[in-house]
Amino acid sequence: MAKKTVRDIDVKGKRVLLRVDFNVPMENGRVADDVKIKEAVPTINYLIGQKARVILVSHLGRPKGRVDERYKMDPVARRLSELLGKTVVKAGDCVGEAARSAVAQMQDGDVVLLENVRFHPEEEKNDEKFARQLAELADVFVNDAFGTAHRAHASTEGVAGFLPAVAGLLMEKELEILGRLLTSPERPFAAVVGGSKVSDKLGVIFNLLTKVDTVIIGGGMANTFLKAQGYSVGKSLLEADKIDLARKLIAEARSREVKLLLPVDVVVAPGPAPGQEQRTVPVDQIPAEWMALDIGPESIRLFTEALRAARTVVWNGPMGVFEMDPFARGTEAIARTLAELNAVTVIGGGDTAAAAKKAGVAGKMTHISTGGGASLEFLEGKQLPGVRALLDK
């Protein structure tokens, strides 16, 4: 169901509570990476242009429901001011007198950033009274925080019970691009799934089996699938309680005639640390005391060949311990291959985005999702609470 967006309503002179995802990394009291802030700028600028009063609310870090100096929003307000080229007033709190008085002094086109919403334990409990206090600051609620749309929190879902709620421009873009993957992808459609844990991704793979032509599995999670096929994986990361599910998934892929590709060779070492001896072995020769830490050159060849035929690719999760150069080749090869494709390429998840950035090809992707967990749940076919709460068109 298509959701109403900020373009579908009149916001002139209105107080607009805009939920953004400003959960950015900090270093020495400065914003270390401002990508998430930049992603919100189009919606903020649209609202300023429409002469709305823009009240921003976000969380930052995990302050555990109490005030924590390290997670105050002041550095974010400073960086946002620079990006917008105008003053952003930082309120002393997100509810109560400090928030109310900051909002009361606003003129049309002004921007106020409320203090970290997670300084209050009620936020993550989706407390109704707290949601009402947030809602009382505004006339309209706009959710532009796709990254937290899978959380039913007061500032993502609760507040929508008290105000007309619509999607921001970033939220709209995410829902449109990810939605198209599930409903009308250009074929052949391939999914590349990696990362360390099968448990995080099983639901996604099962759902994607009904949509895709090819599934490529790498990273630590591939070990569980290799074990399910009878291979010994040495000391590699393994989720023994998921082996039966992996078997089921392999059978399901076969019955749906989806091509399922697993590594045929791996880079092994005694452990995930640099400077150790390492070698490449076929998957049936992983030494008993060693770990598989990346896909090998034959797997890279197999995977990239399959991807070259694709017209749509969704990628979530690295192929190995890509943070360490000796084990980054598989992930970087996938990133470079996607960058060269004449296809729709969508990346979900923080690690995968970081890997594309490390390979220097982030700008060549069609779309890098701003929501790791949210994009996974969306691709799993789940309804996201923060999206469900918005008005339908």
Swiss-Prot record:
Catalysed reactions, as listed in the record: (2R)-3-phosphoglycerate + ATP = (2R)-3-phospho-glyceroyl phosphate + ADP
InterPro entries: Phosphoglycerate_kinase, Phosphoglycerate_kinase_CS, Phosphoglycerate_kinase_N, Phosphoglycerate_kinase_sf
Entry annotated with the keyword Electron transport: no
Residues annotated for substrate binding in this entry: 21-23, 59-62, 118, 151
Binding site residues for ATP: 201, 323, 349-352
Pfam families in UniProt: PGK
GO molecular function, one term: phosphoglycerate kinase activity
EC code(s) of this entry: 2.7.2.3
Cellular component, GO, one term: cytosol
Pathway(s) annotated for this protein in UniProt: Carbohydrate degradation; glycolysis; pyruvate from D-glyceraldehyde 3-phosphate: step 2/5
Cellular location(s): Cytoplasm
An annotated GO BP: glycolytic process
Predominant cellular place of this UniProt entry's protein: cytoplasm
Keywords annotated in UniProt: ATP-binding, Cytoplasm, Glycolysis, Kinase, Nucleotide-binding, Transferase
PANTHER family: PHOSPHOGLYCERATE KINASE, PHOSPHOGLYCERATE KINASE 1, CHLOROPLASTIC-RELATED
Family statement drawn from the similarity comment of this UniProt entry: Belongs to the phosphoglycerate kinase family.
Subunit structure: Monomer.
Protein name as it appears in the record: Phosphoglycerate kinase
Organism of origin: Pelotomaculum thermopropionicum (strain DSM 13744 / JCM 10971 / SI)
Upper classification of the organism: Bacteria, Bacillati, Bacillota, Clostridia, Eubacteriales
